[in-house]
Amino acid sequence: PKDVKGTKMLTHTHKKGDDDQWLFLPSLRRVKRISSRSKTSSFMGSEFSYEDLGSQEIDKYHFKWIKNIKSKKGDTHYILERRPKQKSGYSKMLMTISKKMMSAIKIDYYDRKGDLLKTGVFGNFKQYKVGDKKIYRASLIEMKNIQTKKASVFTWKSRKLGVKHRSRDFNKK
Protein backbone atom coordinates (compact mmCIF):
# COMPACT_ATOMS: atom_id res chain seq x y z
CA PRO A 1 0.00 0.00 0.00
CA LYS A 2 1.07 3.59 -0.69
CA ASP A 3 0.94 4.65 2.95
CA VAL A 4 3.54 2.04 3.98
CA LYS A 5 5.80 2.30 0.92
CA GLY A 6 9.40 2.88 1.95
CA THR A 7 8.94 1.46 5.45
CA LYS A 8 12.18 -0.01 6.72
CA MET A 9 12.93 -2.28 9.65
CA LEU A 10 16.21 -2.69 11.50
CA THR A 11 16.74 -5.67 13.78
CA HIS A 12 19.70 -5.95 16.13
CA THR A 13 19.90 -9.65 16.88
CA HIS A 14 20.87 -11.06 20.25
CA LYS A 15 21.78 -14.74 20.62
CA LYS A 16 19.78 -14.80 23.86
CA GLY A 17 17.04 -12.46 25.01
CA ASP A 18 14.82 -10.21 22.94
CA ASP A 19 16.10 -8.60 19.76
CA ASP A 20 16.05 -4.82 19.41
CA GLN A 21 13.83 -3.69 16.55
CA TRP A 22 13.12 -0.30 15.01
CA LEU A 23 10.71 0.69 12.28
CA PHE A 24 11.19 3.71 10.02
CA LEU A 25 7.82 5.11 8.98
CA PRO A 26 8.29 7.43 5.99
CA SER A 27 4.75 8.82 6.16
CA LEU A 28 5.50 10.12 9.68
CA ARG A 29 9.21 10.68 9.01
CA ARG A 30 10.12 9.04 12.27
CA VAL A 31 11.66 5.94 13.76
CA LYS A 32 9.60 3.83 16.15
CA ARG A 33 11.23 1.39 18.56
CA ILE A 34 9.35 -1.90 18.85
CA SER A 35 9.10 -2.93 22.50
CA SER A 36 9.52 -6.58 23.47
CA ARG A 37 5.88 -6.54 24.64
CA SER A 38 4.82 -5.69 21.07
CA LYS A 39 6.59 -8.65 19.42
CA THR A 40 3.33 -10.59 19.18
CA SER A 41 1.48 -7.62 17.65
CA SER A 42 0.53 -7.52 13.99
CA PHE A 43 3.17 -5.98 11.73
CA MET A 44 1.40 -3.04 10.07
CA GLY A 45 -2.00 -4.75 10.04
CA SER A 46 -0.72 -7.88 8.29
CA GLU A 47 -0.84 -11.54 9.30
CA PHE A 48 2.85 -11.27 10.27
CA SER A 49 3.93 -10.41 13.79
CA TYR A 50 7.10 -8.55 14.72
CA GLU A 51 8.23 -11.86 16.22
CA ASP A 52 7.90 -13.53 12.78
CA LEU A 53 10.19 -10.90 11.26
CA GLY A 54 12.81 -10.96 14.02
CA SER A 55 15.84 -13.18 14.23
CA GLN A 56 15.39 -16.91 14.35
CA GLU A 57 18.48 -17.73 16.44
CA ILE A 58 18.62 -21.45 17.19
CA ASP A 59 19.67 -20.78 20.80
CA LYS A 60 16.24 -19.23 21.42
CA TYR A 61 14.39 -22.52 20.77
CA HIS A 62 14.17 -26.17 21.74
CA PHE A 63 14.12 -28.45 18.69
CA LYS A 64 12.78 -31.95 18.21
CA TRP A 65 13.21 -33.97 15.01
CA ILE A 66 9.88 -35.42 13.85
CA LYS A 67 10.70 -37.15 10.53
CA ASN A 68 12.24 -36.84 7.07
CA ILE A 69 10.05 -36.73 3.98
CA LYS A 70 10.66 -36.74 0.23
CA SER A 71 9.09 -33.97 -1.85
CA LYS A 72 7.36 -34.67 -5.18
CA LYS A 73 10.62 -33.57 -6.84
CA GLY A 74 12.60 -36.09 -4.78
CA ASP A 75 14.21 -33.56 -2.43
CA THR A 76 14.64 -34.47 1.23
CA HIS A 77 12.86 -32.28 3.76
CA TYR A 78 13.23 -32.39 7.52
CA ILE A 79 10.17 -31.91 9.74
CA LEU A 80 11.14 -30.32 13.06
CA GLU A 81 9.16 -29.12 16.06
CA ARG A 82 10.45 -25.83 17.45
CA ARG A 83 9.41 -24.54 20.87
CA PRO A 84 10.42 -21.10 22.13
CA LYS A 85 12.53 -20.92 25.30
CA GLN A 86 11.26 -17.41 26.07
CA LYS A 87 7.83 -15.82 26.14
CA SER A 88 6.29 -16.03 22.68
CA GLY A 89 3.01 -15.68 20.86
CA TYR A 90 3.38 -19.33 19.84
CA SER A 91 3.37 -22.57 21.80
CA LYS A 92 5.26 -24.33 19.01
CA MET A 93 6.08 -24.28 15.32
CA LEU A 94 6.28 -27.22 12.93
CA MET A 95 8.98 -26.47 10.40
CA THR A 96 9.62 -28.04 7.01
CA ILE A 97 13.31 -27.54 6.19
CA SER A 98 14.82 -28.10 2.74
CA LYS A 99 17.94 -30.26 3.10
CA LYS A 100 19.34 -28.77 -0.12
CA MET A 101 19.01 -25.14 1.04
CA MET A 102 19.05 -25.75 4.81
CA SER A 103 16.25 -23.20 5.06
CA ALA A 104 12.59 -23.31 6.09
CA ILE A 105 10.16 -23.70 3.21
CA LYS A 106 7.06 -23.91 5.41
CA ILE A 107 6.24 -23.18 9.06
CA ASP A 108 2.99 -24.00 10.86
CA TYR A 109 2.51 -21.68 13.85
CA TYR A 110 0.47 -22.86 16.85
CA ASP A 111 -1.14 -20.38 19.25
CA ARG A 112 -0.65 -20.48 23.02
CA LYS A 113 -3.60 -22.89 23.36
CA GLY A 114 -1.93 -25.34 20.96
CA ASP A 115 -4.28 -24.74 18.01
CA LEU A 116 -2.96 -24.17 14.48
CA LEU A 117 -2.96 -20.40 13.99
CA LYS A 118 -1.26 -19.75 10.67
CA THR A 119 1.01 -21.20 8.01
CA GLY A 120 3.95 -19.46 6.38
CA VAL A 121 5.10 -20.66 2.95
CA PHE A 122 8.54 -19.45 1.87
CA GLY A 123 9.58 -19.00 -1.76
CA ASN A 124 11.73 -17.21 -4.35
CA PHE A 125 14.95 -18.27 -2.63
CA LYS A 126 18.16 -16.37 -3.32
CA GLN A 127 21.67 -17.39 -2.42
CA TYR A 128 23.85 -14.98 -0.41
CA LYS A 129 27.51 -15.08 0.46
CA VAL A 130 28.24 -14.18 4.08
CA GLY A 131 31.92 -14.47 4.86
CA ASP A 132 32.97 -17.81 3.43
CA LYS A 133 29.47 -19.30 3.69
CA LYS A 134 26.74 -19.48 1.07
CA ILE A 135 23.24 -19.34 2.52
CA TYR A 136 19.74 -19.30 1.08
CA ARG A 137 17.02 -16.87 2.12
CA ALA A 138 13.44 -16.59 0.89
CA SER A 139 12.52 -13.32 -0.78
CA LEU A 140 8.79 -14.06 -0.44
CA ILE A 141 6.69 -15.35 2.44
CA GLU A 142 2.95 -15.94 2.20
CA MET A 143 1.32 -16.08 5.63
CA LYS A 144 -2.16 -17.61 5.80
CA ASN A 145 -4.10 -17.24 9.04
CA ILE A 146 -6.07 -20.47 9.45
CA GLN A 147 -8.36 -19.04 12.13
CA THR A 148 -9.38 -15.80 10.36
CA LYS A 149 -8.91 -16.97 6.73
CA LYS A 150 -6.87 -13.80 5.99
CA ALA A 151 -3.51 -13.82 4.22
CA SER A 152 -0.56 -11.49 3.69
CA VAL A 153 2.50 -11.62 1.45
CA PHE A 154 5.88 -10.21 2.47
CA THR A 155 8.54 -9.64 -0.19
CA TRP A 156 12.12 -8.43 -0.05
CA LYS A 157 13.35 -6.35 -2.96
CA SER A 158 16.69 -5.69 -1.34
CA ARG A 159 18.42 -7.57 1.45
CA LYS A 160 21.91 -7.26 2.89
CA LEU A 161 23.35 -9.90 5.19
CA GLY A 162 26.54 -9.81 7.23
CA VAL A 163 26.91 -6.04 6.90
CA LYS A 164 29.39 -4.50 9.33
CA HIS A 165 28.20 -1.26 10.92
CA ARG A 166 29.92 1.18 13.21
CA SER A 167 28.04 2.59 16.18
CA ARG A 168 28.35 6.07 14.66
CA ASP A 169 26.26 4.87 11.68
CA PHE A 170 23.24 5.14 13.99
CA ASN A 171 21.97 7.80 16.32
CA LYS A 172 19.29 7.77 18.97
CA LYS A 173 16.66 10.48 18.93
Regions found by a protein language model. Name each.
Residues 1-26:
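N-terminal mature ectodomain segment of secretory-pathway/periplasmic proteins
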Residues 10, 20, 30, 34, ...:
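Gly/Pro-enriched, hydrophobic low-complexity segments
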